[in-house]
C-alpha cells in the first residue's frame, strides 16, 4: 500500500504513520518513501483486512491509500510500488470520493494513459482518422465520436443507434461515409482494436486535462 495525506492541510509524520500501521497489522513493515508511507502486508493479513476496517484506520490517520495486487516475491516490490502509485493517481483523477483505491479497479485508465506515452493523441492518428478529424473540424456531426461509440458497442448498429439517438438508416449512412474515409475494413479485429485504443485514450486524455484545468 502507498499512503499519502488526505489533504495538504492534514499531515501526520511518516514515522507516526508507519508505527501506527505496523501496530495495526502484525507482521507488516512500513516506512517513509518519496513523501509517502509504504506498507507491505503479509498475504493473510490482507485477506483479514476488510474495506470497512481499513477505511476506519485511514480516516483516523487522515490518509488515503493506493493498494497494489498481491505479490509473493519481495523483489517485486518495485512493481507493487508502481501499482499502488498508479491506483492513487487514477483514483484521484476520477474525482472519486473514496479513500482506498485498488490498482485492479483502474486497469483500463492506466492502460489508456500508458498507450499514448505522454504524447497528444493525434500523433497516433492513422491517415483515415486524420480525414475524419478534418471532416469534424468543419461539421456539426462528429465522425470520430460516431466511430468511437460504434467501436465501444462492438460494431452493433442497433446499440450504436440507441446510444447516439439516431435512426438506424441515418447511422448506416453515416457509417458508410466513415468507412469510406477510413479506407480500411472495420471487420479486421486488429484494426478495430487500434482505432478503439486511440480514440478511448484520447477521451481519457481530455478528461484528465479538464480536471487539471479546474
Identify the residue ranges that each predicted region occupies.
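Cytosolic nucleotide-utilizing catalytic cores of signal-transduction proteins
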Residues: 1-214
